Amino acid sequence: MKFDWTQGFVPPPETSAAIRVIRPLLIILMSFAHFGILDHLSRMNSAATLDFSNWLMVFLKGGLAKSGVPLLSLISGYLAVLSLERYGYLELLVRKARRLVWPLIWANLLFIVLITWPAQAQNPEVRPDLQIHPFSALGWFQATFAFYRIPANEPLYFLKDLFTCFLLLPLLAAVARVKYLNVAVIIWMAWKCIYLESAFFFEIYPLWFMRFDIVFAFYVGILLYHWKRGLVINSTPVNAGLVSLFLFSSGTAAVVYVLLAQPEHRELFLWLDFVVKLCSVLGCVALMSLLVRHPGRISGLLDWLSPFAYTLFLTHLFIFTFFTRAWTGLFGAPEFFGVSGVLYIVMMLVSAVLAAIVLKSAWTAMVARVRAGA
């Protein structure tokens, strides 16, 4: 018996436009987590002096950098139900395997060959959690498929977790239709997010998540679609308030992260982390609502960059790594609060964006030429 997933809901055009505009900005925010110059963990793991330098470092990597994954996961869950209605489960999985699993494989293997292998050959302390050099089949498998390890190309754990969400899509979509149970599941998932539980049901790959907040946000997206809600907030004052709430919560949490030592206040840090991620979703939804309802140069630029966002996600760690090596070789280590630090961050980001544009454009042109020749 075939389950009828059709709900008769079509997201408003504004929602699609807002998603398109916010996507590249979320990817850029995610890339903040891979700024090697920002050592926020040393500040969080031991009570540090509260000065602007320490606060800003933690604010960028402990706050803003975490805002990309939750909303991208929510958007994926929201659109997943529409795709399930259109294609059915098996065809959707094939499509998502091409979109998520195939890039997970090639981008990690390329990263291993170009970066991790030679780096470990020179220094075994580089990614000691992965046995790449000397060759280990298990180590390469873990580094490629995010098998109970952060993969070689670190941000690509998101692809593995997102594909797991699609594996669970029929279950999540069915539960979302059951009144009261759907809300109870939200509470259960939130609890697992706060206390960093990794398994959906069992500690078995691939149902083991690197970040459980990914499936939590994915499920919230499914619920919003089931409740026939758009993702654009119409009230400008509400949007401004939510953006302010996100910045305030991230800034306040950064103060606590700097002043207190995480090992001694682990539970407080876990709850603060969840609150920051929750506020980040609200703030980023509000921000994309403002961008799409009040179009200008920034929203126009983001809209133009949107087709290159996925390529930026896949390749930015390559560019960051090579750029950092070139910079330190030429100029030495950049100083975070000096001119060198500002130039380093800005130029590295611009280089990553330009590389994504060039690579995506070249690939599109090559595919078009091959198809024309066929």
Region annotations inferred by a language model:
Residues E14-L50, L64, G68-L79, R98-A119, ...:
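Kinked, hydrophobic transmembrane alpha-helices enriched for aromatic residues
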Residues A17, L56-V69, A146-D161, E197-Y219, ...:
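Interfacial loop-to-helix transition and helix-capping segments at the boundaries
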Residues A65-G68, L72, V81-E85, L100, ...:
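Hydrophobic alpha-helical segments with transmembrane-like composition
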Residues V69-V81, K160-L171, C193-N234, V275-G296, ...:
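Specific transmembrane alpha-helix
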Residues M1-V10, L291-S306, L317-A374:
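C-terminal "closing" transmembrane helix and its immediate cytosolic amphipathic cap
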Residues P12-S16, E85-V94, L171-L181, H226-N239, ...:
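Membrane-interface helix-boundary motifs at transmembrane edges
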Residues D4-W5, R229-D303, A326:
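Alpha-helical transmembrane segments and terminal signal-anchor/GPI-anchor hydrophobic tails
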Residues N45-V58, Q131-F135, G139:
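Perimembrane loop-to-helix junctions flanking transmembrane segments
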